[in-house]
Regions:
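Short flexible coil/turn linkers enriched for glycine and charged/polar residues
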Residues: 299, 347, 562, 576, ...
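Gly/Ser/Thr/Pro-enriched helix-cap/hinge segments flanking short amphipathic alpha-helices
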Residues: 260, 288, 687, 703, ...
Length: 775
């Protein structure tokens, strides 16, 4: 996540769309961030809008807009660094283990940093609004064009066969950039010999390197067109009226700095000139900056807003909507004008309108939001914007759209209507009556829409609302639910149907009771059933809370494949009462101790339920050896010649639940595609002592829901309203924050200690041989 800092009272708050190192806004305030392998990501919404509807689950706001992402072609001109050449020579001579290739692959993004939108005036016009990002590993700066398309942009490489800047100096590390006061692009060069993490160098080489080489040589570069020597302004000496005039300057630094100084001075003499620019400036950016400056002086009024909402430039109208929000409660003229903007020709204006309508009082937003749903509801981002604004009017909006036959006749319309029904009843449970009336009324002759709504409600609403729908008060919805379940049972049992279709039907059975579905689901766990169907049966059983669920899963355990056992264990470990049955099975021998993966042992050590922790400690009392002793004992694996094919089998059995190589396994843990370049000593250390150095994104968390379920995994994504937990079986689950009872880090890597219990020295040599062979 990102954060917003207020220098007035030294407070800050979290916001959406954080990156790793680098954040920049274009002239109109659209925010870009970057990460090591994601050079350009566009932030699509402000989290302050999302939190108004705590039931809304949305994707992370930062979206990769580079078509090739990490694999965008880069044209490096620097040679392989000396330490890489040394490592290659030592490997080829057999002095150190590992690949004899010269360092990690180059030519694509592995260290993207410092994303910056060019907003200066020193470069030729075609550079305006270009995107720049450094790649420290490749010693270059990449330039891209931001090509507009609907709500998103596409970052397309601007150069052909070359880079904007490519240095032959291996120490050149462009970590950050800025638009300078002279209109040029300024670059912070960290200037270091070593930029990689320690894990990517064998310890035997690392100990001979000066990891601080270059620490005293950092520098700032200024990139300017040949023949130009721009001067540096001193705006701190400018008069207030001069600062106001600078809001129309073609250089973004001048506009931003003038805006800041006007805010700092709080000079009331600026109000008149600002109002002149806000209404009469020939530049849309000047008009927009003037509006914000008036707001900063607490001088912005409804008349200013009304004029801006009618501005001929769409970007001015977009910002006027944001500035109008404080006036929406009291000024009927502003309210009416905003409502009339549902027909605005610009999609970005309507997108902002969908967010801003949420501040209208009472149920007044229902009509314009319904109109936007009809016009833009097929777009996923517009749906998020609309649904963020429905907290005060969801039921009224549903009533209007349910009566619109043309809207619900389309698949996007039915989909939106179903989502709205679930949101409305979650926000205000009494609105289930609105939905039931619609199903019995305008939707009585619209079977597709009614079925979509009932299915969505059963999937998303509370157990109390589900009971209401399935009970005598459910009316026609009850009959529809019965039809859906009958169809699902028939499809799930039909072995002639494709596995994917059957699996979807099996998952629909979670709407029924465990008592009625116990036997059919148990039958679907049989080993002769397709894997997809078995997995769906496990998921459906996990959705129930009955104590007997664990018995059904454990009865099928002997015939389950390793992958299916991982899924079953994930389900069983979700509730303390089920873990009790699992521990019974371990004690009785029906589940072997070797079947319990190290990751599960890690979870048991930190399980929220004390009784579970205590009992597990007794059952698995052998404990784990000291890490340094294990690492020392396994050094023999580095000296042995391993077998690649046997190593592949070791990987598939012990590692594939969290890692993926050569189309085998799950993408849960760290990416292993370039693991051979770390050196086998480092790889062995990572396997046997995973907690020696843990990156934050690979920490293990335990999450307890308000319904008593326990999830364990890594936090793979988060928004203002929800967290996404990536689980050991490779699946991911999105959990609303309001459904979280407890969330805590275990302080441990998600990769467990204790793999030596499954992998002996000979098998480790085979595994290392396999990992070292993967290209």
């Amino acid at each position: 996540q990102g954060f917003v800092f207020d220098p007035r009272d030294e407070t800050f708050q979290l916001t959406g769309g954080g990156g790793q190192h680098g954040m920049s806004m274009d002239d109109w305030g659209r925010t870009y961030v970057c990460a090591n392998s994601e050079p350009f990501s566009l932030v699509m919404y402000d989290s302050r809008y999302l939190v108004r509807n705590p039931f809304l689950q949305a994707p992370p706001p930062a979206v990769n807009v580079a078509p090739a992402g990490k694999f965008t072609r880069l044209f490096r001109t620097s040679t392989v660094e000396p330490w890489r050449a040394l490592r290659t020579r030592l490997r080829s001579q057999g002095i150190v283990p590992g690949s004899d290739e010269g360092g990690s692959p180059s030519g694509f993004f592995t260290g993207a940093t410092g994303v910056t939108v060019y907003r200066g005036d020193a470069f030729p016009a075609e550079y305006s609004a270009n995107l720049f990002v450094g790649d420290v590993s490749n010693n270059l700066i990449h330039r891209a064009l931001a090509v507009a398309g609907g709500l998103l942009v596409t970052a397309r490489s601007a150069e052909t066969g070359r880079e904007f800047v490519a240095s032959s100096d291996n120490y050149f590390r462009p970590v950050q950039m800025a638009n300078g006061p002279d209109g040029c692009l300024w670059v912070i060069d960290m200037y270091r010999e070593l930029i990689e993490g320690a894990a990517f160098l064998p310890p035997s080489i690392l100990k001979h390197m000066d990891v601080g080489s270059g620490v005293d040589r950092g520098r700032i570069w200024r990139i300017m067109p040949a023949g130009k020597r721009p001067s540096l302004p001193r705006l701190s000496k400018s008069k207030t009226v001069e600062l106001v005039a600078l809001l129309e300057h073609p250089n973004g630094w001048h506009r931003d700095t003038a805006s800041r100084l006007l805010y700092e001075r709080q000079d009331p003499s600026a109000i008149g000139p600002l109002r002149q620019i806000a209404t009469r400036s020939s530049t849309p950016l000047g008009r927009t900056h003037a509006l914000y400056a008036l707001a900063g002086l607490k001088a912005l009024g409804p008349d200013d807003i009304l004029a801006a909402l009618a501005d001929p430039e769409s970007r001015v109208r977009e910002h006027a909507l944001r500035l109008a929000e404080p006036f929406c409660h009291d000024d009927a003229r502003v309210q009416s004008r905003m409502e009339a903007m549902v027909g605005d020709p610009d999609p970005l204006v309507r997108y902002q309108l969908a967010f801003s309508l949420g501040v209208l009082p009472g149920t007044r937003a229902a009509g314009p939001l319904a109109a936007l749903a009809i016009k833009d509801g097929a777009d996923a981002w517009c749906r998020i914007a609309i649904l963020s604004s429905i907290s005060g009017c969801a039921g009224d909006m549903f009533r209007q759209l349910a009566g619109n036959r043309a809207f619900r006749a389309s698949l996007p319309g039915r989909t939106f209507l179903a989502m709205l029904a679930a949101q409305a009843t979650a926000i205000r449970p009494a609105d289930v009556d609105v939905v039931l009336v619609a199903i019995d009324g305008p939707l009585a002759d619209d079977q597709p829409a009614a079925r979509a709504i009932v299915a969505e409600l059963m999937d998303k609403v509370t157990s109390e609302t589900r009971t209401r729908l399935a009970g005598t008060g459910g009316g026609r919805a009850r009959a529809i639910l019965a039809e859906l379940l009958d169809e699902a049972r028939a499809t799930a049992a039909d072995e002639k149907k494709p596995p994917k279709i059957r699996a979807a039907a099996v998952r629909a059975l979670r709407f029924a009771s465990f008592v009625t579905e116990r036997e059919p689901l148990a039958a679907l766990l049989a080993s002769r059933q397709p894997g997809e169907v078995q997995a769906a049966a496990v998921d459906t059983l996990a959705s129930y809370s009955d104590a007997a669920v664990a018995g059904v899963l454990l009865a099928a355990w002997p015939g389950m494949s390793p992958k299916m056992r991982a899924s079953a264990a994930e389900a069983i470990f979700g509730r303390p009462v089920w873990i009790g049955a699992f521990l019974d099975a371990v004690e009785s021998g029906s589940v072997g101790r070797s079947d319990v993966e190290p990751s599960r042992l890690n979870l048991l050590k930190s399980y929220p339920d004390l009784a579970v922790r205590t009992r597990a400690a007794k059952i698995f009392s052998s404990g784990l050896a000291r890490r340094q002793d294990v690492v020392a004992a396994y050094q023999k694996a580095l000296e042995r010649k391993g077998d690649r094919e046997r190593g592949r089998a070791v990987f598939e059995k012990n590692c594939s639940s969290c890692h993926r190589l050569e189309n085998v396994g799950q993408r849960v843990g760290a990416e292993l595609s370039a693991i051979r370049d770390r050196g086998l000593e480092a790889v062995l250390l990572n396997i046997l002592d995973p907690n020696r150095e843990v990156m934050p994104q690979f920490l293990s968390y335990v999450l307890v829901t308000t319904s008593g379920r326990v999830l364990t995994g890594m936090i793979s994504a988060e928004t203002a309203n929800s967290l996404t937990i990536k689980k050991p079986d490779g699946s991911a689950e999105n959990v609303l924050r309001l459904d979280i009872e407890e969330l805590r880090s275990t302080g441990q890597s998600y990769m467990p200690e204790g793999l030596e219990k499954q992998i002996d020295v000979a098998a480790m040599a085979d595994l290392l041989a396999y990992l070292n062979s993967v290209k």
